[in-house]
């Protein structure tokens, strides 16, 4: 069993734990940007994370995504070589899908970091904070 939960709500805010990139078959989307994975594939991985985040957010909303008042913040960790500097472009894969799904309420504050490694060798891990109605 995990030593954490997928989300915690306090007041009107819900904090989603980090979600790692997974392929359509459920396997970990492993690799490092700047070595194994190009920016475009990293964006696809970040978009896949956004799909999973939305699923967790839906669970936090009792199944009703209309309760999402705003996506407040996204924090993205990109498994990167030391000389890779396009973490922000990779993270756009997540941010753009949130905008498509939630419209103006999907526009959010964001941080994108390059890190030396992510659990299970995943290429991207993203966490999210949302405000609920």
Residues covered by each model-derived region:
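Short, polar/acidic, helix-capping and beta-turn segments at strand->helix junctions
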Residues: 1-133
